[in-house]
């Protein structure tokens, strides 16, 4: 199981889309879609949108391998990922640094890819989204850490430059994981 984490604006979705395009048609890799209590037209990643009530029902029914709450939303990784892992596939999921303890409990073999970018790059990308002023963004970035806390197998990828540069590193991690994956 590979979980992709990093701050807003680091380019997690862009890099996951890049890797999915590079691996299109190749067996052994599964990019899972998160279930989120956010509208599909809210922008951002391609996800399965559900209401809070629906999410709670799914969670109570054991439909998630991992679930967590952040920023007023609930997120879930479908339990169907276990079938892919049992088949020997490399499963790639968009996660959260705050949810890594849950991922660690749910998956015995876990690789974390921490996507980071320079603060000025994060600020520019976040500013382009138009949700916060540049000053608010810079203050928030000064207070935040890009590090992953905990005892995890982490590869940090700097996505401050060209997507192809960070994409090459992501592809190496995925290829190495495929080589060591066991059914």
Swiss-Prot record:
Q: Which gene encodes it?
A: phnN
Indicate the family of this protein.
Belongs to the ribose 1,5-bisphosphokinase family.
**Which InterPro entries does the record cross-reference, listed alphabetically?**
GK/Ca_channel_bsu, Guanylate_kin-like_dom, P-loop_NTPase, PhnN
Q: Provide one Gene Ontology biological process annotation.
A: 5-phosphoribose 1-diphosphate biosynthetic process
Identify the stretch annotated as signal peptide in this record: none
Q: Tell me its EC number(s), please.
A: 2.7.4.23
Stated role: Catalyzes the phosphorylation of ribose 1,5-bisphosphate to 5-phospho-D-ribosyl alpha-1-diphosphate (PRPP).
Molecular functions (GO terms): ATP binding; ribose 1,5-bisphosphate phosphokinase activity
What is this protein's name? Ribose 1,5-bisphosphate phosphokinase PhnN
Its UniProt entry gives the catalysed reaction(s) as:
alpha-D-ribose 1,5-bisphosphate + ATP = 5-phospho-alpha-D-ribose 1-diphosphate + ADP
User: PANTHER family per the record?
Assistant: GUANYLATE KINASE-RELATED (PTHR23117), RIBOSE 1,5-BISPHOSPHATE PHOSPHOKINASE PHNN (PTHR23117:SF8)
What species was this sequence derived from?
Agrobacterium fabrum (strain C58 / ATCC 33970) (Agrobacterium tumefaciens (strain C58))
